[in-house]
Amino acid sequence: AVCVSLLGAANIPPQPLNLLQFKNMIQCAGSRLWVAYVKYGCYCGPGGTGTPLDQLDRCCQTHDHCYDNAKKFGNCIPYFKSYEYTCNKPDLTCTDAKGSCARNVCDCDRAAAICFAAAPYNLANFGINKETHCQ
């Protein structure tokens, strides 16, 4: 089940449902807030180039590649594809049909959330200048 608080929602721009689901998966698998990953390293957040800075940054690079692979299956747009999953902290289970776009995207997000939870967090890699550190 997905629970989303609408308190303060007037100040939050609308986001694709998938990104909300991914945020909730991150919270289910680990203890860090999703915002800790938005500007981390070379690959966490929008885009990504260069060599990943550490294990956590590699999790984000792998997630990017997973989404790229999901896009190869028909009309699958990962950022906008909602999916079904269950959270039994810290376990995540994707429940859509295997091979479907929704399942592929869910599997990408699940793997990333688990990877994030297992990876050490280096505060020095948050908010770096990607132009100078990610060549």
UniProtKB/Swiss-Prot annotation:
Q: What compartments host this protein?
A: Secreted
The residues the record assigns to binding Ca(2+) are 43, 45, 47, 64
Active site (UniProt): 63, 109
Q: Per the record's keyword annotation, is Calcium included, yes or no?
A: yes
Tissue expression summary: Expressed by the venom gland.
Q: Which PROSITE patterns match?
A: PA2_ASP, PA2_HIS
Query: In which domain of life is the source organism classified?
Result: Eukaryota
- Which cofactor names does the annotation list? Ca(2+)
Q: How is the cofactor bound?
A: Binds 1 Ca(2+) ion.
Q: Which InterPro entries match?
A: PLipase_A2, PLipase_A2_Asp_AS, PLipase_A2_dom, PLipase_A2_dom_sf, PLipase_A2_His_AS
Q: Which reaction does it catalyse?
A: a 1,2-diacyl-sn-glycero-3-phosphocholine + H2O = a 1-acyl-sn-glycero-3-phosphocholine + a fatty acid + H(+)
Q: Would the keyword Metal-binding turn up in this protein's UniProt record?
A: yes
Q: Which GO terms describe its cellular component?
A: extracellular region
Q: What does this protein do?
A: Snake venom phospholipase A2 (PLA2) that inhibits neuromuscular transmission by blocking acetylcholine release from the nerve termini. PLA2 catalyzes the calcium-dependent hydrolysis of the 2-acyl groups in 3-sn-phosphoglycerides.
Q: What is this protein called?
A: Basic phospholipase A2 KBf-VA
Report the source organism.
Bungarus fasciatus (Banded krait)
